[in-house]
Amino acid sequence: MKRIGTASSAGLLVLIVSGIGIVFVDQRGSASPTSQQHLGCAQRAETSAPTVFHDSERRGRATTVLIGPLELRGVRSYRSPRVFSQLGKRRGYYIAKVALVVQARRSVRLRVSGKRPDSVLLAYGSAEAGSNELLIDSCAATTRARTRPGFVGSGTLFTGVFELTAAQCVNMVVSDRATPGTWRTRLPFGRKCLS
């Protein structure tokens, strides 16, 4: 591998490497965010029982946000400035763990935006770098579980994090890739979302 050139523009350093192509590196030292990630049934997480989508009996539902065919479990716990300020940081981003549960047999696109294009990213599955867009294909409810007897359930669980540069209001758009359905919400991370 031989480095054959560099260019710099708007805080982004471009390394041109023979045999590899182009690698983008942020001048702060971290890789630039990818434009989108894809998660499928194989990248799911599992619990000791089938995952139930929009379970009204589940403990912790007070911290859950439902947006169309998607549940964000634990996201409301980060609206407090005190809780948000205690989050750990990685590569200059606060790390907020939020479980995604997608209704069975759905194909959805999830997009987030904040104060700046890279101020909020999603890192789910085995992603090394965050992205502002996820494409998610959930399992059928009758998909066999890998870690226990039985089936996946009416929701497919994905674990990961929101990466945020600062406390902010995050805009989220969820769209069903098979139908014209689109849902929008604003998520408070360490501050209130004003109308």
Segments predicted by a language model, with ranges:
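N-terminal export and membrane-targeting signals
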Residues: M1-L13
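Non-catalytic macromolecular-recognition regions in eukaryotic signaling proteins
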Residues: G21-S195
